[in-house]
Amino acid sequence: MKRMMLCTLIGAATVTLTACKKDEVFNSLPDFLVSDVRQFDYDGNTDDLLTAGLGPEGLASATPPAFVDALNPTPAELRRLAIYNNYRALVDTAPGGGYGSLFGPAVGNASGRIPGQEFIAMMQVPGATVPVTVMAQVPDSFDPDFPCMVTAPSSGSRGIYGAIGTAGEWGLKKGCAVVYTDKGTGTGAHNLATNTAQSVNGTLTMEPEEALFRADLDAQSRDDFNSQWPDRFAWKHAHSKQNPEADWGRHVLQSIEFGFYMLNTLHGRELGNGETLRTINPRNTLVIASSVSNGGGASVRAAEQDEKGLIDGVAVSEPNVNPAVDRSFSIRQGNGPALTEHSRSLLDYTTALAVYQGCANQAPGIRDLAPLNGMFNPPATGQNICHSLFNKGLVSGATKDDWALDAQRILNEDFGVQPEQNLLAPVHFGLAVAQSIAMTYANAYGRAGVEDRVCGLSLAATGSAGAVVPLAPAAEASLFAASNGIPPSAGVNLVYDNAEGQPTSLAVSASPSSSQVDYGLDALLCLRSLAEGRDVVTGEPLEGAQAELHEAISRGISAVRASGDLQRKPTVFVTGRADAILPINHTSRPYVGLNQAVEGRHSNLRYYEILNAHHLDVLNGFPGIGDRYVPLHHYYFQALDLMWARLTDKQPLPPSQVVRTVPRGSLTTPLTLANLPPIQSEPAEADRIVFTGNQLQIPD
């Protein structure tokens, strides 16, 4: 624990400032806040910080908490459902998968409920025009004499409760304050037809100043848009024109400062003159930057940008980092070939997955073996995608099997997707993961508006045949609690406005170029072309507005690239080798290499690659997945434990290593620690990950 080093000399009757600014000594409202701070007290019985009063059993229940009035849910009801949905989206709560025995609210905390106080506000970084949500949770178990704080930026594009079951649970159970931010993402759904949007408490509002997000269309522009494209939504992450990812690190740093303000509001020393001494500050408070996926990437960027010494250590899982491209080093797994074409951007590899994966789903060895492939991916659509790709010269071969095999080869060989990811990629395609990321991030990076309808894509509810319909009022009323922030989600789908016939849900749309239901491949190829800067079918450079948008997207991607400079902060990454959403050859692995190139022997980053683990633990509750894969969540909590021991007891972090887990083989066999060997303090030589000779070497 850091020793207390106050910048004040406290006498009998006076406080004398030494070398500190006044706002560093006395508690003051951060100037980046753009709203009042809302405070809520939870007793740990009827309601609480972690489970919203549901307890461990309620979170595990397949029946979500209901609203008394489906059209007018209360803020408390929306919060409860948001916590329920966000917890279950990140943590496998199915029986036998480790919930309740290895992790979960009641593990190490009998009731599972955590009393305390919650503070919510809106904030902005300099230059931004759209607010970001920030929240601090302070459990009753927080000890002001030994203060600690954990960051919990939301994973994915989720809202303010998006990290409640990951960094939130670990930090609250540790007695730490937990600071959250939605990173400028979250639901933020502006119904352009009704002009309603979500307020900070989740209820619908028509007041611009109360909304989480509204498209910057004046009344006439909105009417004109609605007359041509009725019942559409603008979404905060996609359409705010802010490229929020460029500021994710700053959002996390601001959330920490907000946390210090709230902690001193509660525990600072009142001096009797209207001032409160900041007795809890970065010098005496242990701060771990954490979270998973996009939230993990945000905390990594925060550590890189930390100029005030706010962060002591970093512990993240499967972080979405876009490392700066550095070809001075390569990556090699086992005796395989050295990979130099690493560090592709999220939009680059995601648009490739969006284009080719639908065909690769039909490859021999994949189509009948990949879990849930037949359930989520109609074979006829996959075959049409293959046929369209072949007709455009994008795959080769004599048969549909050949085309599908070539699509898989392209992803593995040309785009560096690990073979371990191949069996999980089909279910992700069926869940529209790559498609939704490609659409949202192309808009966000290019700072496009809803009115631009990039690649002819928009967002709306659709009926059974795929045609656009108004979103049901009850569904809209619950969007704050039900949506993951990146459609298709909670009844709002991706719509291909240029589909043959009429605007149609992308998944069942026919491309004009093929007249086949090929998942709107023309739209996906358009997104791919924007990522490359050339028409991927003709090979010709983009022209006009498309070329300008590509340049804007390229600038947006450059703004989110990570530097690799962690400022020597102790850092832990845990990542599953089978991650089929954020391929490890473009995220965690090259970040480790970049960090070595930047920090060298001064690096304190450790990388633990977990075999038989992937990105979405929630899928482990399904047959074919839970029997093959283990929860990465378990190792994320172990990473946090290791970081805690490093910062409090000076325990050394274990060397970088591959962790060889043992899948349980059947969902009827409960997961135990025998399946989950710990990260070793002294791993075998055959398991060590090393950087030598400008190469990151990873054992098979």
UniProtKB/Swiss-Prot annotation:
The record's annotation in InterPro entries points to:
OHBut_olig_hydro_put
The UniProt record lists the EC number as 3.1.1.22
Disulphide linkage map: none
Judging by the UniProt lineage, the source's domain of life is Bacteria
Signal peptide interval: 1-21
Known catalytic reactions: (3R)-hydroxybutanoate dimer + H2O = 2 (R)-3-hydroxybutanoate + H(+)
The positions flagged as active site in the entry are: S293 (charge relay system)
Q: Where in the cell is it found?
A: Secreted
State if Plastid is listed as a keyword: no
One GO MF term attached to the UniProt entry = hydroxybutyrate-dimer hydrolase activity
Q: Biological process GO annotation list?
A: butyrate metabolic process
Query: In what pathway does it function?
Result: Lipid metabolism; butanoate metabolism
Keywords in alphabetical order, please: Hydrolase, Secreted, Signal
User: What is the first-listed, main subcellular location in coarse terms?
Assistant: secreted
Cellular component per GO, a single term: extracellular space
Q: Which residues form a coiled coil?
A: none
Q: What does this protein do?
A: Participates in the degradation of poly-3-hydroxybutyrate (PHB). It works downstream of poly(3-hydroxybutyrate) depolymerase, hydrolyzing D(-)-3-hydroxybutyrate oligomers of various length (3HB-oligomers) into 3HB-monomers.
**Similarity field:** Belongs to the D-(-)-3-hydroxybutyrate oligomer hydrolase family.
The protein here is known as D-(-)-3-hydroxybutyrate oligomer hydrolase
Q: Which organism is it from?
A: Marinobacter nauticus (strain ATCC 700491 / DSM 11845 / VT8)
